[in-house]
Amino acid sequence: MDLVNLCSKLKKGTVYLKDDYEDIVLRMEIIDNSTHCFIKRRGRKEVEVDSKEKDVFESKMDGNEISKEEYDEFR
């Protein structure tokens, strides 16, 4: 997803992405004017990660938007 589109969607609410290459899903939201990023890997619990990390940035760029339901069902 391109950065302009991602930023626009984040201003409206939580954004969910799936990166098929890394086999992870991301949940991003703005809390107190700061972007918080959470990832979930198969078989693991959701964890908060630094949204500026290189791998997270690549997943944001390469990921496809998914629904909250798809995010919740990812295991």
Where are these regions (language model features)?
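Arginine residue identity/basic-tract feature
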Residues: 6, 10-11, 27, 41-44, ...
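Negatively charged, low-complexity tracts enriched in Asp/Glu with abundant Ser/Thr
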Residues: 1-18
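Mixed-charge, Lys/Arg-enriched low-complexity segments
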Residues: 54-75
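Acidic, low-complexity, intrinsically disordered interaction modules
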Residues: 21, 25-61
